[in-house]
Amino acid sequence: MKIVGNTVIKPFHKATCHCGAVELELSLPNGIEKPRRCDCSICRRKGAIVGSVALDGIKILKGAEYLKLYQFNTNTAKHYFCSNCGIYTHHQRRSSPNEYGFNIGCLEEVNPFDIGDVVTNDGVNHPADR
């Protein structure tokens, strides 16, 4: 997905938390890939639409000291959020540990509501929990 609403997704697109303390640069040469929601316990609560990038596809431009790590259950996935404003920015995925999921709502000038319907992953019945 290379355009969301009127916003062209840049090959290197900036993402920020709400307060601006955390700034990321995402490598998105193919636009937003795999936009989705998840119905696991944490994703239901944060409600974000998420895209994916390779582990080397996120660069922290500023605010690394504001990023806090949250883990639960198997402690495999690593969820990061801004300790100042509380916004979830990205996570290292449990189902694909070679990828980060990122909060599409953090992309500069992108309104995730312009994406429309997206697939919802079954995080309640995650294969790693069987």
Language model features: what each stretch is:
Residues 1-16, 21-130:
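A short Gly-Trp-Pro
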